[in-house]
């Protein structure tokens, strides 16, 4: 287990990504084609930036990435990658959405590797994680384009099945995935929604 964790940490450093979490998104991307060239991507809870950087590479120079976090991320997209705009805001505050919309009003993909500060209480941690996930889903309903894609990290426990059902109701296809690069002992999984059913006005 430790060897696997060390492998991904070392690989991230070698590949010039801030954190090993990039390989969780990479694994999901290879299997489900979440992000395409030219896409607009909103990354909630983006710090330290691995997912945003990887998403910018997938989207290419005609795409755009907006990363939001309470902690200020730094750096930009790599050569031949989409520009990255960093926003230091709380996703629970209206000012965050206003700041995002000043850059771009809508997105084709919403991604989130966000996690709460853990307490050690499994039930409490799971519920706090779910609260954040529901917040990302609410934001998706406001900014995601029709047929857009969504992926969000969540800790299993508590009302987790209800959250999965909520995603299923909003997307044509939804599933729960556990990347190989996730720590074996971790309760984290990712809920994936493909092809958002945007309500018709």
Swiss-Prot record:
The keyword Cytoplasm applies. GO terms for molecular function: rRNA (uridine-2'-O-)-methyltransferase activity. Keywords: Cytoplasm, Methyltransferase, rRNA processing, S-adenosyl-L-methionine, Transferase. Disulfide bonds: none annotated. S-adenosyl-L-methionine binds at residues 49, 51, 69, 90, 113. It catalyses: uridine(2552) in 23S rRNA + S-adenosyl-L-methionine = 2'-O-methyluridine(2552) in 23S rRNA + S-adenosyl-L-homocysteine + H(+). SUPFAM superfamilies: S-adenosyl-L-methionine-dependent methyltransferases. The active site is at 153 (proton acceptor). It is an enzyme of class 2 (transferase). Its main location: cytoplasm. It comes from the Bacteria. Pfam families: FtsJ. It is found in: Cytoplasm. Its EC number is 2.1.1.166. Transmembrane segments: none annotated. One of its GO terms (cellular component) is cytoplasm. Specifically methylates the uridine in position 2552 of 23S rRNA at the 2'-O position of the ribose in the fully assembled 50S ribosomal subunit. Belongs to the class I-like SAM-binding methyltransferase superfamily. RNA methyltransferase RlmE family. This is Ribosomal RNA large subunit methyltransferase E. It comes from Desulfotalea psychrophila (strain LSv54 / DSM 12343).
